[in-house]
Every structure is written in C-alpha cells, then in structure tokens.
C-alpha cells in the first residue's frame, strides 16, 4: 500500500469563474427589485423611528421560548 498514491483529477472548468451575461431586461428587473427593497427598508426605518421600543419588545424572548 505504501507504493500507491492517490491523484485527484484536475478540474480546470470549476476553477474558472465566469461573469454571467445579464440581458438588459434582467438589469431593469434588478433595478426595480432594488427599488422595492429600498422602499421596504425605508418603511422599516420609519417604524423603528416612531415606535422602536415596541418593535424590540416583539423580539424579546420570554421564559426560554
């Protein structure tokens, strides 16, 4: 057994990272999605500014639950 060595086959295909091609329509959808996420984050910020104490209480665990 001491004379046998294991060799791993080289996988150059997996080592190369390819940049995905994004069509213009997908880019527009990504921008729309970003705008939706930004709007949601703005809404969360407003809730936290106006009622942060109650918001935090909603996440407090009681009795090990």
Swiss-Prot record:
InterPro entries recorded for this chain? Ubiquitin-like_Pup
**Domain of life of the organism encoding this protein:** Bacteria
What positions belong to coiled-coil segments? 26-49
* Annotated spans, Disordered: 1-35
Q: Where is the composition biased (Basic and acidic residues)?
A: 1-14
What post-translational changes are documented for it?
A: Is modified by deamidation of its C-terminal glutamine to glutamate by the deamidase Dop, a prerequisite to the subsequent pupylation process.
Region (ARC ATPase binding), start-end ranges: 21-59
**UniProt keyword Coiled coil present:** yes
Q: Which UniProt keywords apply?
A: Coiled coil, Isopeptide bond, Ubl conjugation pathway
Q: Which Pfam family is one of those matched by this entry?
A: Pup
Which GO terms fall under molecular function for this chain's record?
A: proteasome binding; protein tag activity
Gene Ontology biological-process annotations: modification-dependent protein catabolic process; proteasomal protein catabolic process; protein pupylation
Mark the residues carrying the PTM Deamidated glutamine. Answer: 65
- Give cross-link positions for Isoglutamyl lysine isopeptide (Gln-Lys) (interchain with K-? in acceptor proteins): 65
Q: Which pathway does it operate in? A: Protein degradation; proteasomal Pup-dependent pathway
Biological role: Protein modifier that is covalently attached to lysine residues of substrate proteins, thereby targeting them for proteasomal degradation. The tagging system is termed pupylation.
Similarity remark = Belongs to the prokaryotic ubiquitin-like protein family.
| Domains: entry comment | The N-terminal unstructured half of Pup provides a signal required to initiate unfolding and degradation by the proteasome but is not needed for pupylation, while the C-terminal helical half of Pup interacts with ARC to target proteins to the proteasome.
- Quaternary structure and partners: Strongly interacts with the proteasome-associated ATPase ARC through a hydrophobic interface; the interacting region of Pup lies in its C-terminal half. There is one Pup binding site per ARC hexamer ring.
Which protein is depicted? Prokaryotic ubiquitin-like protein Pup
Species this chain originates from? Kineococcus radiotolerans (strain ATCC BAA-149 / DSM 14245 / SRS30216)
């Amino acid at each position: 057994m001491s004379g046998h060595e294991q060799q791993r086959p080289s996988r150059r295909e997996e080592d190369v990272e390819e940049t995905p091609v994004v069509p213009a329509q997908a880019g527009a959808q990504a921008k729309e999605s970003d705008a939706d996420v930004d709007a949601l984050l703005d809404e969360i910020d407003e809730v936290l500014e106006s009622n942060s104490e109650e918001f935090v209480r909603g996440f407090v665990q009681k009795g090990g639950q």
